[in-house]
From Swiss-Prot:
Annotated GO MF terms: DNA binding; protein heterodimerization activity; structural constituent of chromatin
DNA-binding region, residue intervals: 17-21
Role noted for this protein: Core component of nucleosome. Nucleosomes wrap and compact DNA into chromatin, limiting DNA accessibility to the cellular machineries which require DNA as a template. Histones thereby play a central role in transcription regulation, DNA repair, DNA replication and chromosomal stability. DNA accessibility is regulated via a complex set of post-translational modifications of histones, also called histone code, and nucleosome remodeling.
SUPFAM superfamilies referenced in this protein's UniProt entry, alphabetically: Histone-fold
Organism, scientific name: Trichogramma cacaeciae (Moth egg parasite)
UniProt main location, coarse: nucleus
Name of this protein: Histone H4
Record PTM N6-acetyl-N6-methyllysine, positions in chain: K6, K13
Source organism superkingdom: Eukaryota
Subunit structure: The nucleosome is a histone octamer containing two molecules each of H2A, H2B, H3 and H4 assembled in one H3-H4 heterotetramer and two H2A-H2B heterodimers. The octamer wraps approximately 147 bp of DNA.
InterPro entries in UniProt: Histone-fold (IPR009072), Histone_H4 (IPR001951), Histone_H4_CS (IPR019809)
Family: Belongs to the histone H4 family.
Length: 103
């Protein structure tokens, strides 16, 4: 055993994957009912059919900006994993302070 504790197999310690799944159309995973639930939480009663695609586009841009900033913090710290604090700092930098995740 090479110092891996009781796990034995050493899962997650392998090399690069041979076949990486191509990521496309994942934005469609934000379903119509999910957008409807978010709108309901915001106090919306009736929703136009054009809203769903528009919401997906806005959400995609927002997440791209937050993730870009969070990854920048992670790379600066020279660590391989994006932490919750990286995301908190990225949101704070964009003027959207988030409480409850440390710091």
């Amino acid at each position: 055993m090479t110092g891996r504790g009781k796990g034995g197999k050493g899962l997650g310690k392998g090399g690069a994957k041979r076949h990486r799944k191509v990521l496309r159309d994942n934005i469609q995973g934000i379903t119509k009912p999910a957008i409807r639930r978010l709108a309901r939480r915001g106090g919306v009663k009736r929703i136009s059919s054009l809203i769903y695609e528009e919401t997906r586009g806005v959400l995609k841009v927002f997440l791209e900006n937050v993730i870009r900033d969070a990854v920048t913090y992670t790379e600066h710290a020279k660590i391989p994993t994006v932490t919750a604090m990286d995301v908190v700092y990225a949101l704070k930098r964009q003027g959207r302070t988030l409480y409850g995740f440390g710091g």
